[in-house]
Design a protein with these regions (language model features):
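Alpha-helical segment proximal to the catalytic Tyr-Lys
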Residues: 128, 147, 169, 173-174, ...
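A conserved structural motif in NAD(P)-dependent oxidoreductases
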Residues: 208-219, 230
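Short C-terminal tail/terminal secondary-structure segment
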Residues: 94-97, 224, 235-249
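Substrate-binding pocket helix/loop in short-chain dehydrogenase/reductase
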Residues: 98-100, 107-112, 204
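Active-site helix of classical SDR
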Residues: 123, 160, 168
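Conserved glycine-rich cofactor-binding loop
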Residues: 8, 15-16
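Short, small/polar-rich loop/turn modules that mediate ligand/substrate recognition or access, typified
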Residues: 176, 181, 234-236
Length: 249
């Protein structure tokens, strides 16, 4: 069974990690995927992999902190595949890691732009296209940082990721009645470049009840659930995929 047959999905941050795994999985589940990242070479490699496996894919290089990037993504979904049903607003950045009193204002703005403003810009562009199709599903990649735990030097990142939950709830209040489900995926530690070196990954594993970090594919499966008909009555929710961190913190 293909859960996303004939659906069209936008996935940002798709050149590596959770975004790459999500793009591959969604394409395997029948969706046409419009993928985005800033790095052209890595993004094109993902697109080639999907195409070689028989998937439908189109790559759009761009910075999700800019409104025009999201407009181009939505337009590509319409032009190439006929519309938009699903968006996984996954792109983000940890930003500078330092105590809040030492954080320059420009770094604060950079971190919020990469993680929160980018999500707002994405949803603002995506909602009208979904309404034209009678509904859809939006998934934001948040984090256990800021929602379940605070980590040293990551106040800006945690604030941005926690604020995504306010965006999820507000969008749900506005658009659930019109058929758009909006939810957040909250990963714990994940085996990606963002997680750091082996020592940092081992430290992160200790934060979880399962005493390990996730693979990107495990998070992609959670995103698939939220985007698919399996979650047809799930709206305005936070799905912790954190290896039990929230249960034992």
């Amino acid at each position: 069974m293909t859960l996303l047959n004939n659906k069209v999905a936008i996935i940002t941050g798709a050149s590596s990690g959770i975004g790459r795994a999500t793009a591959l999985l969604f394409a395997a589940q029948g969706a046409a995927v419009v993928i985005n990242a800033r790095g052209e070479r890595a993004l094109n490699e993902v697109a080639e992999t999907i195409a070689d496996l028989g998937g439908r894919v189109h790559a759009v290089v761009g910075d999700v902190g800019l409104a025009q990037t999201h407009e181009r993504l939505v337009q590509a979904a319409a032009d190439r595949f006929g519309g938009l049903d699903i968006a996984v607003n996954n792109a983000g950045a940890v930003g500078a890691i330092k105590p809040l009193a030492e954080l320059p204002l420009e770094e604060w703005h950079h971190t919020l732009n990469a993680n929160l403003t980018s999500a707002f810009l994405g949803a603002r562009s995506q909602v009208p296209s979904m309404l034209a199709r009678g509904g859809g599903a939006i998934v934001f990649t948040s984090s256990f940082v800021g929602t379940s735990v605070g980590l040293p030097g990551m106040a800006a990142y945690g604030a941005a990721k926690a604020a995504l939950m306010g965006l999820v709830k507000g969008l749900t209040a506005d658009y659930a009645v019109k058929g758009i489900r909006v939810n957040a995926l909250l990963p714990g530690g994940v085996d990606t470049a963002m997680a750091g070196d082996d020592a940092q990954k081992e430290w992160a594993a200790g934060l979880h009840a399962m005493k390990r970090i996730a693979s990107p594919g495990e998070l992609a499966q959670a995103a698939l659930f939220l985007a698919s008909p399996m979650a047809s009555f799930v709206a305005g929710s936070a799905l912790y995929a954190d290896g039990g961190n929230a249960a034992v913190k």
